[in-house]
Amino acid sequence: MKLFGTDGVRGKAGEFLTPFLAMKLAMSFGECLPKKTGKILVGKDTRRSGYMIENALVSGLTAIGYDVIQIGPMPTPAIAFLTEDMRCDGGIMISASHNPYYDNGIKFFDSFGNKLSQEFEEKIEKRYFENNFNLKTEKEIGKSKRIDDVIGRYIVHIKSSFPKHVNLNGMRIVLDTANGAAYKVAPTIFTELGADVITINDEPDGFNINQNAGAMHPEFLAKKVLEYRADIGFALDGDADRLVVVDEKGEIVNGDKLLGALAYYLHKQNKLKNNGVAVTVMSNGALEKFLNDMGIKVYRSNVGDKYVLEVMKEKDLNFGGEQSGHIIFSDYAKTGDGLVSALQAVAYLIQSGKKASEAFDLFELYPQIQANIQVSSKPPLNEIEGAKELLDEVEKEGYRHLVRYSGTENKLRLLVEGESENKAKELLVKLKEFFKSKLS
């Protein structure tokens, strides 16, 4: 596809992502949707370019007869929830997630708050390039209205995911909202539940989103957790669909260890649907062993929360995630939601009766050794003579491997993982030399 990437349409604002592109994309989306209520919800993060893109989207949608509800800066998962809750035909989020301020993006949701399938995205692209839209007459043009009080609906929804018999009284929590979409909603939720909240990076100016802040730079949160002697710290990214946790010692909790602890928490409460968890191919093998030892099945997907969700639907699961911090509790959210994940993490912490440094350290990770090699071509890996035999050899040694081409560069990415770091290095050297001889 020419426009859509792994998570909507994304690029440099004003260069790739122009108002013309946004307007046409909005019309294409609107004309592909089944029209029921005639309403589409639009939200955004805190980037300056959000104003430009929002107005272009509204222009395109009203031109083809839709009424638009604009709700201002809100997390991506809030758009997913509110689209369904407010009976809209579709939802649009303007955000480039964890990218710098100069990028922006457009994410689409159907009337149930689900991200679009690849087939639906292809349909939108086809409409976009046909460039022949059904513009409405002056009497049929849609209207737009801005609603600023929907934040309350989302707060009530998020708080409903937290156990009613638990409160956060006496707990000190540092929140890093990355100067992004959750800068108002995150501290409100934790304060209402009784926590002593210290918020950092909560003064967006249109340019400072994700800048040395949030889930991409948790080292700043780590310093503040120590400085304020907090029990735990949570870092979100620009659109609050990702979570990074810092324990009371100022240590960043590994993403796979976080997934393991949350799966353990659900399992102990008999809330883990079909006793299974969806993770990606990047998750550490030690997580899989830890879960298997409890009788929990592990299913792996391609990288991307969208693919994790596909596996969750296919296997009828209610929990999954990526080591990068996209965690999906599908009983409460249709997509990764950093705030739902943070509330589940703190509920587990309180009920464990332990310090965060112990509660989230339930197993040791296997060493992972990685390398990239430059390639001059990208033939299918299964067609390279001798590749299957070599990879089988790695597996026979009891080591896991991941060999894949980069989606954006002329590189082959290699990973070997297992109990011994030295053995993993030795096997990686073998793989590196073999693929270099075949592809460089």
Curated annotation (Swiss-Prot):
Q: Looking at the keywords, is Metal-binding present?
A: yes
Query: Cross-referenced PROSITE patterns, in alphabetical order?
Result: PGM_PMM
Please list the reactions this protein catalyses.
alpha-D-glucosamine 1-phosphate = D-glucosamine 6-phosphate
Q: Which cofactor does it need?
A: Mg(2+)
- Residues annotated as binding Mg(2+) are 97, 237, 239, 241
Which residues are modified to Phosphoserine? 97
Q: What is this protein called?
A: Phosphoglucosamine mutase
Highest rank taxon of the organism: Bacteria
Q: Does the keyword Transmembrane apply?
A: no
| Function comment | Catalyzes the conversion of glucosamine-6-phosphate to glucosamine-1-phosphate.
Q: How is it modified after translation?
A: Activated by phosphorylation.
Looking up NCBIfam families in the UniProt record yields: glmM, PRK10887.1
Q: Which family does it belong to?
A: Belongs to the phosphohexose mutase family.
Active site location: 97 (phosphoserine intermediate)
Q: Which GO terms describe its molecular function?
A: magnesium ion binding; phosphoglucosamine mutase activity; phosphomannomutase activity
Q: Which UniProt keywords apply?
A: Isomerase, Magnesium, Metal-binding, Phosphoprotein
Taxonomy-wise, where does this protein's organism fall, top ranks first? Answer: Bacteria, Pseudomonadati, Campylobacterota, Epsilonproteobacteria, Nautiliales
Which Gene Ontology cellular component annotation is one that this UniProt entry carries? cytosol
